[in-house]
Amino acid sequence: MLADMCVGVYKAAMNYEIRPHEFSFNTQESLFTGLGLGFLAATAVVASPSLLDLPITAAEVVRIAMRAGILLYQKSQDLEQLSLDSSLESWTTVVRGLDESIVRGELEKFNKSMETPPSSRIYISVVEPDGSVFISGPPSGLREFFNKSGKVQSAPRAPLPVYGGPCHAAHLYDRTHTEWVVSKVNPEIASRRLSGHPLVLSMGDGQPLAGENARDLFESATYVLLTSIIRWDSVLAAVKKLPHWKQDTKLQLETFRPSSPAVHGLISAVQSEYPDCTVSVDDLGDWIIDNSLEPPTIPIDSRIAVVGMSCRLPGGSDDLQRFWELLEDGRDVHQKVPGNRYDVESHTDMTGRRLNTSHTPFGCFIDSPGLFDASFFDMSPREAGQTDPTHRLALLTAYEALEYSGYVPNRTRSTTRDRVGTVYGQCSDDYREANAGQNIDMYFIPGNYRAFAPGRISYFFKFSGPSFNCDTACSASLAAVQIACSALIRGEADMVVAGGLNILTGSDSFAGLSRGFFLSKTGNCKVFDDGADGYCRADGIGSIVLKRLSDAQQDNDNILGVILGTATNHSSHAISITHPHAPTQEHLYRSVLSQAGIGPHDVDLVEMHGTGTQAGDAAEIESVTRVFSPPVPRRSHPLYISSVKANLGHGEAAAGITALMKALLIFQHNAIPRHVGIKTALNSKFPDLERLNVHIPKETIPWPYRSNRKRYVMINNFSAAGGNTSLLLEEPPVRPDPQGPPQTRFVVALSAKSTTSLRRNLESLITWLEGNRSARLASLAYTTTARRMHHKHRIAVHGASVAEIIQALHQRGSRAELGLLVSKPPSVAFIFSGQGSFYAGVGSQLFKEYPPYREQLQRLDEICQQNGFGSILPAITDTDADVSQLSALVTQLTTVCVQIALCRLWRTLGVKPAVVIGASLGEYAALYAAGALSASDAIFLVGQRTLLMQKLCTANSYGMLAVQGSVDDIRRCVQDRTYEVACINAPRSITICASIKDIVDIQQSLVSQGYRSVKLNVPFAFHSSQMDPILDRYEEIAKAVSFRSLQIPLISSTLADAAVQSRSLVASLFLRENTRAPARFAEAVAKAQDMGLVNSHTVWVEIGVHSTYSGAVRATVADLQAIVPSLRSDETNWHTLAVSMCTLQETGVPLDWNEWYRPFEPEVRLLDLPSYRWDLKNHWIQYNGDWLLVKDKRPRTDQISAATPSLRTALVHQIMEESFRPDGGEIVVQSDVMDKEFFAVASGHKMSGRPLVSVFSYPDIAFTLARYMYSRLKPESPLPAMDFGQVRVLQGLLPRKDRSKPQWVRMRMRADPQCAALQLSISGLSDESSRHVEEKLASGVVRCGDRQSWQDEWADYAHLLTTRIVTLQQMAENGQASRVSRDLVYTLFKNIVDYADHYRGIQSAVLHGLEAVADVILAPSNDSRWTAPPHHIDPITHVGGLVLNAGHATDHHNTIYVMEGWKSMRFAEELVAGELYRSYVKMNPARDGSGFFVGDVYVMREDHIVGKVRGMTLRPLPRILMNRFFDPPDDGDGLATQHIQPHDLPQVQHQPSPTTDSGPDDDPKDPNTGPLTPEVDLPVAPSVEKANTKLVRGALALLAAETGVEPDGLTDETEVSALGIDSLLSLVLVEKFATELQVNIQSSFFLESPTIRELKEYLTASW
């Protein structure tokens, strides 16, 4: 019906638009009426003085119709709830062939015999001229009526499609409803005078509607619609009696349904009375199929609001505040290309002679582009590392921009996920070409191709709107904004996340732009400078959130700026494609200004494209001055011009979005920052800017808001490909200060996806609040609850002031468990309590100050009054009332109505119960909540029952006593008094009934024996024999009501059981039992637990006037998670709800905070709070070497040369590849572990009886390769001393048991031209499908040094070392330290490592705590093919292992210590066999508390230090795991290594990264000296005891290795989805499980296992 009415009004408007001359009506010649909602449509035309007024009047009438529909729906739900899954049932049936009087008599008889509640009566709603009668009422009542009324039952009848609820019902509606429906009409329309307007005849009695203005007309029409029986014959009679008629009157009917009986009846009636009257009928319905009318093509409002933004920009501008500070400080942040991009020295040649080099070493760069929170975005570290950092930072900034905008999915129409799009500009993808392309892996395509950048955002946030990646070169991001605006204006989306992306990692674009003469060789963009010599490339990531302005205002968003227009054109007439063209730019500006309706002189600031090129700056200044500041007419206000590129460089695809964000910050800070691009003098090609009133700000210029002049900024963003994009930005609209809602206590919520981020979020909010103590608490609460996305780790606090919130947050921060973890939303149970705790003014504060609750109670109060029970509102509003003077009828009805209203409130707030339970009187509200009873039925039953009590029972003759004791306790204590058990709430919470005299004696007896008891303030003893007189009569009354199907399970305290279906329950019998039988609450809850309806994780919400059942539930449900009250008598309503909502928020119950704040949203604001604090780790594939320079010029060595290699030692075998160039060199060597000499090295060093290659073999490899490369790169220079440091041991190298096939190890060393640092990586090779796969074993760096300087340094403290050694030896002599012989040393060692004889160099040792000194004599070598023999390096240094694995300072019985690595190893002279050396060490626990030990080993010959191993690190390993770690594979071609892991790293790096912390001797400038990230394959300590199997450990190790997640992160509660296992990675894991674990599983297994715990349990149970 509503749709018909809307169409009707619209059709009328369109019809008269075509024929405007016909829109002329007056009292003498025009007459209107209508049926149903069509009656309201008629009032829209009558209330419109002219055709121009009709659209806005029609819109108001549509709103009236909507509110009327809402009222009908509410009434239908009160009378008979409609469940979501139930079919629609008609509220009206037409009966033909019976006189109205007969039907009315049958209705009266039925309603009386059935004792139908007054509000549920069946009634007549329409009487047609042919005698047909429309009978209306609740569908269940209609069915019952037609089944029992013989006369009507036999008459022809048909249900009508009336599903909206009861209408034309005077017993249900009155003038208050009419006033509510019309109350929101626009005052300008409502006050419109209607003198001389045409008549509107009532469809009830045919009388003209009275009223002096439009509001009166609307109210009268609505009242007729709601209350009057439609009698069309009365309308016809009234029409015939009008004084307008003459014999030859012409009647013109305009109708939408000319064939309807009503129209035919009208024509027949008129022509029978006036035969000469001619009738013409205009069928306005033809318009429906008329396609000649085209919809308007110009939108009413094309203004676009920017509501959120975020950035990652150079110069440390990782957020908007730092960006503004950079602008305000006037910083120029250009720098040399950092080492994490490429080696700037080797890839730059300012002469341009060297192939593929850049001419400039400069750029502007984001500090740490690899930082990313992979787990937040459900990405594995493996996928994150292979994903372009532009994509990752797009995700981060998109989230921050959405957070800034207050985005919550589906909160409003404009935030519906299906209507949100993403558009990003991007013109390069260096990471794909230079970084990820070095080792192409499974995520190469989705991780690097441009389309995936916006697509990944849409996928993560589940946006279904349009997603575009836009490339227009340098103007890509502003072009993306234009696309976004167009999508919004055209209605293709309601919100768009847009931005620009640029991260520079490769040298190719630098080289290409250099050779195209785009780039400056001297530094940053010198915008407007006379010496401008090109632009400076820059990183840039920016994201903004866009909405239509009207939507943003409706959503209560913070509007940062308004885009009035944007356009793009192309410089097709330029002299070349890359050359700018001023006339084309000029045309573009005028187009944008015209689009916005703004004059050029209204614009006071132009944010220029300003690349700092001679051609670009000159063309742009020409076009700008011609349009915005021509000589004539001269501007009256200054025009300021500037460019952000002077600060941050040219961000290329991100340039436009950077300029836009700058302009938005200018509005925020009311100032224009100074321009820093002029380094020498103003460009001499510029016109006289002073004369044109054009100014370049040389200092920060205040630019405040003015009420009489709006601020506009034109933003230019031009493309090297010839495109020009401009955007006109208007300052945000001014909003009045909010007054704030009436609440006195508010909830502030925090959440995160990890505990690390949660703590950081907490700390940042505390810091912000301490600096903003004047912040509005209501807005703070609104921002953190209604305008935030909530994650699984949660904190919620409440307070009445900001100071209270700060204190509460500090208290939470001091807890060991910071917040609650919500793995999934818990189930919710509603408890409806009884009536024993009633008090005056129950819920009065909520009623007075929270409109939705008040409206619910007012609706319920109407039902009370319609049933003749009177109003309950005085008992709520009068807080000083004497409860003892209130009747039982009032208290019981108030209790039930409050419970129903609270139930509706909680449901509106998103708290949906999975099960409900009622106690005593509360069972009525529980039946309502479960769907068995309507609100009207519940109120009717409670009211009738209470009236019977008041009539048939004597008030206050019986009493009820709540006892803290068991039934047996009471029986034992009370033996001489008669009582009945009324309620068993918990095993030791019993309510009994007795006569007043006995109840007093019983209470005294219980108290005397130590039992607490409370007499309930109730006039009757429910569930006792006092109820017997009312039972039969109440059962009869209750037969008028039938239970409907339960929508949710009901735990019945009457039945002490859980009802899932209500079909077996007879309402009258059940309600009789509820009145008389004891309420067995505890048994019911226990039964619900047995049935699985509730458990310890269920959150209980008590709905009643006070919290009375929390103790009972806790006594019955073990380990109860939470129970919260709705109201309490001892605290304010706001306090109770705040505490309860805190608990619900923390436990994960979905709360619709937006709905909570909806009534007061205009009075709160979205605050600019600190953004989400990420748990960042560095995911970065470092570009290594020079392949971008040499490309295919490098010599290939695909086949192993047959010639004798030029390098061969025991450990270094075949040269696979070598290249030596002016910019450095690289060598790749391959060795066979199964080679006799190599295997002998491993055999001399066994762990768990298995050969293991000593890590002290690696110095020999490192020094051998380093000397070889040095001699090749610097053949004329003598070999220097060398230091092998930054060694990280990633895996142990164990020879396979099967020695029949080779086991390859590959060594790769890279060197810079000066050989200052030679980087070594050692990897094992496995053969997977004939494809060699490398797994890194160790890494380190050889540095060249000066032997003499080392000796000079050591000489300064050699005497101190000697003194300490002497002291230790004296302590050994005195028994204060332990002296250990050679045999005992290696006997002790044998528990861990079994050394061959030539490794056993220690002759004796002295141990004291973590300190030791050893005498060492090195064994001779059998041949000379060693550079640093392992059997020399190992014994000279393994004194550190002796201290930890054999001394008394550590628990070496349960723990062993294995080598992790060292920072530096240097020897000032060669070690000589047979010489006596002395090794000293003191190990110290690592400062980070990891259990690692670190120490320096000093090697002395006589009194001189000849060597030092600095920072030698050993890690602990449980001794029980030795066999697992050092048990090599039996066969196969796979890599025969077992993973031994170092401690957790602060970052995840996928190649050497300069962000790794360096030691004091490390060269921080070298980009290739960072440690390599270990593969992760540690055993994870089991937390599920039954899952501690080899299979589970292997599975977890595989998961860790393939996802890149740290093993410690694989806890039982870890969600598999958070590991980033997608469909692609799941296929890899399936293959790995099959080949390595011999377990065959489906790929969906990883996508369907929620947590690691379930994964473990599945594996344990299945295998």
UniProtKB/Swiss-Prot annotation:
Its EC number is 2.3.1.-. It holds the Pfam family Ketoacyl-synt_C. GO terms for molecular function: fatty acid synthase activity; phosphopantetheine binding; polyketide synthase activity. It comes from the Eukaryota. Residues 301-731 form the Ketosynthase family 3 (KS3) domain. The active site is at C474, H609, H650, H1245, D1434. CDD domains: PKS. The keyword Phosphoprotein applies. Residues 1209-1527 are annotated as: Product template (PT) domain. InterPro entries: Ac_transferase_dom_sf (IPR001227), ACP-like_sf (IPR036736), Acyl_transferase_dom (IPR014043), Acyl_Trfase/lysoPLipase (IPR016035), Ketoacyl_synth_C (IPR014031), Ketoacyl_synth_N (IPR014030), Malonyl_transacylase_ACP-bd (IPR016036), PKS_Beta-ketoAc_synthase_dom (IPR020841). Binds 1 phosphopantetheine covalently. Residues 1213-1349 are annotated as: N-terminal hotdog fold. Residues 830-1149 are annotated as: Malonyl-CoA:ACP transacylase (MAT) domain. Residues 19-168 are annotated as: N-terminal acylcarrier protein transacylase domain (SAT). Multidomain protein; including a starter unit:ACP transacylase (SAT) that selects the starter unit; a ketosynthase (KS) that catalyzes repeated decarboxylative condensation to elongate the polyketide backbone; a malonyl-CoA:ACP transacylase (MAT) that selects and transfers the extender unit malonyl-CoA; a product template (PT) domain that controls the immediate cyclization regioselectivity of the reactive polyketide backbone; and an acyl-carrier protein (ACP) that serves as the tether of the growing and completed polyketide via its phosphopantetheinyl arm. PANTHER family: FATTY ACID SYNTHASE, SI:DKEY-61P9.11. Non-reducing polyketide synthase; part of the gene cluster that mediates the biosynthesis of the bicoumarin kotanin. The non-reducing polyketide synthase ktnS first catalyzes the formation of the pentaketidic 4,7-dihydroxy-5-methylcoumarin from acetyl coenzyme A and 4 malonyl coenzyme A molecules. Further O-methylation by ktnB leads to the formation of 7-demethylsiderin. Then, an oxidative phenol coupling catalyzed by the cytochrome P450 monooxygenase ktnC forms the 8,8'-dimer P-orlandin via dimerization the monomeric precursor, 7-demethylsiderin. This is Kotanin synthase. It comes from Aspergillus niger (strain ATCC MYA-4892 / CBS 513.88 / FGSC A1513).
